């Protein structure tokens, strides 16, 4: 009786350890801060970290406010991630942050809290409320067809650094 109980225990231990190994080997998608906006871009995790890196590197911070369940955000994200010019500028010339929640800085929502919303902050830590999209009722929103304007606004943010700082 003791012998069979011991054998049963060993069998249970073997099965459970093999199961644990199989679970560990299961492939999981990597967790990334890009959230689909561009996996080759270096993203910061928080607004405070973004401000620190913007000041340190003398690059503008681009803040993208979005939500996963927003169809407009998803459409913009898809085109943003496919646009090579935006991806290159974002990787090389900007500190990048995408947020799915609001920050405590009220300057990042001068005309309200809505998504998608893209704001620029220069290295002197000034929110550039003068860099706007094409909509008068949502100044900082962009739609997929607005990507040429977003490219122009990214270039404008870079020019303003050179001329003002």
Curated annotation (Swiss-Prot):
Alphabetically ordered keywords of this record: Cytoplasm, Endoplasmic reticulum, Signal
Main location: endoplasmic reticulum
Gene Ontology CC terms, in alphabetical order: endoplasmic reticulum
Top-level taxon in the UniProt lineage: Eukaryota
Record's signal peptide: 1-20
Motif interval(s): Prevents secretion from ER: 162-165
Localization of this protein: Endoplasmic reticulum; Cytoplasm
Gene3D superfamilies, per database record: Glutaredoxin (3.40.30.10)
Pfam family, one: Thioredoxin_7
SUPFAM superfamilies for this protein: Thioredoxin-like
InterPro entries, A to Z: AGR/TXD, Thioredoxin-like_sf
Tissue and organ distribution: Expressed in the ciliated cells of the airway epithelium. Not detected in the mucous cells.
Molecular function GO labels: dystroglycan binding
Effect of a null allele: Knockout mice develop ciliated cells with normal-appearing cilia and histology. However, ciliary beat frequency was lower in airways from knockout mice compared with control mice in presence of calcium (20% lower in the absence of stimulation, 35% lower after ATP stimulation). Knockout mice show reduced mucociliary clearance. Knockout mice do not seem to show endoplasmic reticulum stress response.
Protein family: Belongs to the AGR family.
Role description: Required for calcium-mediated regulation of ciliary beat frequency and mucociliary clearance in the airway. Might be involved in the regulation of intracellular calcium in tracheal epithelial cells.
Subunit architecture: Interacts with LYPD3 and DAG1 (alphaDAG1).
Record's protein name: Anterior gradient protein 3
Organism in which the protein naturally occurs: Mus musculus
Protein's gene: Agr3
């Amino acid at each position: 009786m003791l012998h069979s109980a011991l054998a049963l225990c060993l069998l249970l231990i073997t099965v459970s350890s093999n199961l644990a190994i199989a679970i560990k080997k299961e492939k999981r998608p990597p967790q990334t801060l890009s959230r689909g906006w561009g996996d080759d871009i270096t993203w910061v995790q928080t607004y405070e970290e973004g401000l620190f890196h913007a000041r340190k590197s003398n690059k503008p911070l681009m803040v993208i406010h979005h939500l996963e369940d927003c169809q407009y955000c998803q459409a913009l994200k898809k085109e943003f991630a496919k646009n090579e010019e935006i991806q290159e500028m974002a990787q090389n010339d900007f500190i990048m942050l995408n947020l799915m929640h609001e920050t405590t800085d009220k300057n990042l929502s001068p005309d309200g809290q809505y998504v998608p919303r893209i704001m620029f902050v220069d290295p002197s830590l000034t929110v550039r409320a003068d860099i706007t999209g094409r909509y008068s009722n949502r100044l900082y929103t962009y739609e997929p067809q607005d990507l040429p304007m977003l490219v122009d606004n990214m270039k404008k943010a870079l020019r303003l650094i050179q001329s003002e700082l």
